Curated annotation (Swiss-Prot):
The protein's required cofactors: Mg(2+)
GO CC term (a single one): cytoplasm
NCBIfam families cross-referenced by the UniProt entry: pheS
Membership in a protein family: Belongs to the class-II aminoacyl-tRNA synthetase family. Phe-tRNA synthetase alpha subunit type 1 subfamily.
Binding site for Mg(2+): E271
First-tier enzyme category under EC: ligase
Family matches, as InterPro entries: aa-tRNA-synth_II (IPR006195), aa-tRNA-synth_II/BPL/LPL (IPR045864), Phe-tRNA-synth_IIc_asu (IPR004529), Phe-tRNA_ligase_II_N (IPR004188), Phe_tRNA_ligase_alpha1_bac (IPR022911), Phenylalanyl-tRNA_Synthase (IPR002319), tRNA-bd_arm (IPR010978)
EC number(s) on file: 6.1.1.20
Catalytic activity field: tRNA(Phe) + L-phenylalanine + ATP = L-phenylalanyl-tRNA(Phe) + AMP + diphosphate + H(+)
Stated name of the protein: Phenylalanine--tRNA ligase alpha subunit
Cofactor binding: number and manner: Binds 2 magnesium ions per tetramer.
Places the protein is found: Cytoplasm
Length: 350
């Protein structure tokens, strides 16, 4: 083995002994650095003739290439070993049972809304929808609310930008505007039949959604959920209201012995008007009268604002708080619990 072969073999052995990238770089310097052994051999050719330089230089370059190849091979081996070590440290046991994803559920008020829509849907009622930012006309005027009614004041109603002095915009204070919008569209769709003296299909609709009033305590929230119902036809009376609402309450609370009481009251959009109370015969609320809704026969002015003749068309309306119904159904005493976002509370309703 000549000098150059011995040098290459020595470099290979030194590289093989390197156990880290830093140690390998030190070994590289011993052979390929500025003061390395290969560099020293190149410097030693200064005293050779031209022909000898050519032969000697070619041999040294071959040795240098062999050393560089050994260096790169060892460098790659160290990198592969480091990668394998990292993969081993980060390895996952795929045979372990996985973590189950948390199971979500509907909010209790949403459960109540679904139940109400299903019950009234089985009685032939459609479900209306409408904007939460309303005009003064749909929220108050169309519902026969006087200009000086306290509900119109800024102490009770959230007014918003975008309207005019004579027609301000506001956050709807109830879901009744959806009933008016639905009725107006219904009448427009059947205007030709009405003008021809033909009967119009009845308006039978519920209007569930969010409403807003300036109020906040254990039983009230500035934002609350409401569901109102409307039935307009040529021969719809208070007796129909009692039958429909009694049937709804008994099915909603799953209590056939539930008792309902209709108390005279006043609302500008109905005449006559009544508050509806319920009384359970059994359970923790047994024997107590609990107010659940307002109702009445639709006022002639409201029927007229729908585009109908109040001499021919009549009907009833009712409105109930979804939050209160949810509180009664699940035995919750503080309305604010529904909106605090506490998963410990909400998970009970899955």
């Amino acid at each position: 083995m000549n000098e150059l072969d011995s040098l290459v073999e020595s470099a290979r052995q030194r590289f093989a002994q390197s156990t880290s990238p830093a140690d390998l770089e030190n070994a590289k310097a011993q052979f390929l650095g500025k003061s390395g052994r290969v560099t020293e051999l190149m410097k030693g050719m200064a005293q050779l003739c031209v022909a000898e330089k050519k032969t000697r230089g070619a041999a040294i370059n071959l040795a240098k290439q062999a050393i560089e190849a050994a260096l790169n091979a060892r460098r790659q081996a160290l990198a592969d070993a480091q990668l394998q070590q990292q993969l081993t440290a980060d390895a996952l046991d795929v045979s372990l049972p996985g973590r189950q994803r948390g199971q979500g559920g509907l909010h209790p008020v949403s459960l109540t809304l679904e139940r109400i829509e299903g019950l009234f849907g089985s009685m032939g009622f459609d479900v209306a929808d409408g904007p939460e930012i309303e005009t003064d006309w749909f929220n108050f005027t169309a519902l026969n609310t006087p200009e000086d009614h306290p509900a119109r004041s800024m102490h009770d109603t959230f007014y918003v930008e975008g309207g005019t002095a004579g027609a301000p915009n506001l956050l709807r204070t109830h879901t009744s505007p959806m009933q008016i919008r639905h009725a107006v569209q219904h009448v427009k769709a059947h205007r030709a039949a009405l003008d021809a003296g033909q009967p119009m299909p009845e308006i039978r609709v519920i209007a569930p959604g969010r409403a807003y009033r300036i109020d906040s305590d254990a039983t009230h929230s500035p934002m609350f959920h409401q569901c109102e119902g409307l039935w307009i036809g040529e021969n719809v009376g208070f007796k129909d209201l009692k039958v429909i609402f009694t049937g709804f309450c008994r099915r909603f609370f799953e209590s056939d012995d539930l008792v309902l009481r209709f108390r005279p009251s006043f609302f500008p959009f109905t005449e006559p008007s009544a508050e509806i109370d319920i009384r359970f015969q059994t359970g923790p609320l047994a024997g107590r009268w609990l107010e659940v809704a307002g109702s009445g026969q639709v006022h002639p002015n409201v029927v007229r604002n729908m585009g109908l003749d109040p001499e021919k068309y009549i009907g009833f309306a009712f409105g109930m708080g979804l939050d209160r119904l949810t509180m009664l159904r699940y035995g919750v005493s503080d309305l604010r619990l529904f909106f605090d976002g506490d998963i410990r509370f909400l998970s009970q309703f899955r």
